[in-house]
């Protein structure tokens, strides 16, 4: 089954903030983060069901090289709705707010 992946603006902001942080640590690392996170997002069209729920119905697709980070998402019908690209150790309260905003 192939899903349509929806990426709202806050997810773009998450992705850019993490890439900028990585680029400050080592030039070029931010671009590597962007490439890998975009690859994971693109793969969700076909692999969304492979990732187990982490919180309620929120799933987490972990990045390989940047394994502390993941793409958080929910499945609604034929859509994968991205919630965030964040560090996996963050307290989940922020995630619940974004999930509630989906309705």
Annotate each PLM feature.
Residues 31-32, 52-54, 93-94:
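Short, hydrophobic secondary-structure boundary micro-motifs
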Residues 39, 46-81:
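Basic/aromatic recognition patch in beta-strand/loop cores that engages polyanionic ligands
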Residues 1-34:
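Arg/Lys-rich, positively charged N-terminal/basic patches that mediate binding to nucleic acids
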Residues 21-25, 44-49:
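Short arginine-rich
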